[in-house]
Amino acid sequence: MAAKIVITGASGRLGRVVGEGLAAGARSLLLTDIADPPQPLPRGAEFRRIDLTDKAAMLALAPETAAVVHFGALPAERSFEEILGPNVIGTYHAFELARLAGARMIFASSNHVIGFHERGTLLDEDSVMRPDGFYGLSKCYGELMGRLYWDKHGVESLSIRIGSARPEPRDVRQLRTWISHDDLVRLVEAGLAAEGLGCRVAWGISGNTRRWWRDNGAESLGYKPQDDAERYADALDPAEPGSGPVALRYQGGGFCAEGYSRDEPSPADIFAWMKDR
């Protein structure tokens, strides 16, 4: 049985991007999702309908798994109960699959693991986690699971803290957080090819002029982004419309504001922050 790269969440927005990109490099792919298969199916790829929370179905893939590219998740803020199944239990099953297969894991983490850091703060991969919601919290869990599985079982993993993966940035925040689809595929490819990967974290961003994050982890993999959000800057509204003071204060933007119940920062604090922008 030929070993394949298993992509979870392969029918999702970014799962399709990564599947198409890896297929273009003549990779042998096994695509999985609870949803219908992506159309058209990438050339040479096989699809199986699998629920991430079905442990037996996930682990049954081990004999034919060369690597796991785990993009399956609820991709937005939801209640804890909704997040728990796909994002927490499902991620555990994906790491168990990698362990049983003796395969490496590429984990789709998120910038929302650090969302409550203030804007203007330059972060690196070792900056403290400050998730901005249950979605971000679930990605913290996935990154820490990568650490556990490396230390305890020797499972290599790359956690990619994906910024804003879109065809082009949609607002001025994304001038800092954007990663093009092509660069996302390049970063996944770098993680699959790297020798001595161990357990690493990398920021999933393009070569943006206005970046908030120092991407030493990705550079050490040989990742060379080809795109920069700055080319879109003149077309974007500099006011970041629709964002209140909480969203504008923190790197996570609107995720920080959703469900926020503390007293909002005082006007003095807001003005101090604006002065330092």
Predicted regions and their residues:
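N-terminal Rossmann NAD(P)H-binding glycine-rich loop of SDR-like oxidoreductase domains
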Residues: 5-24
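NAD(P)H-binding glycine-rich loop region in Rossmannoid oxidoreductase-like domains
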Residues: 50-86
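Glycine-rich NAD(P)-binding loop of the Rossmann-fold in SDR/ketoreductase-type enzymes
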Residues: 53, 82-93, 129, 137-140, ...
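NAD(P)-cofactor binding segment of oxidoreductase domains
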Residues: 68, 80-105
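Catalytic helix-loop patch of NAD(P)-dependent Rossmann-fold dehydrogenases
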Residues: 85, 118-157
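Conserved Rossmann-fold NAD(P)-dependent oxidoreductase catalytic core, especially the SDR/UDP-sugar
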Residues: 93-130
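Alpha-helical substrate-binding/gating segment
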Residues: 161-168, 178-199, 207
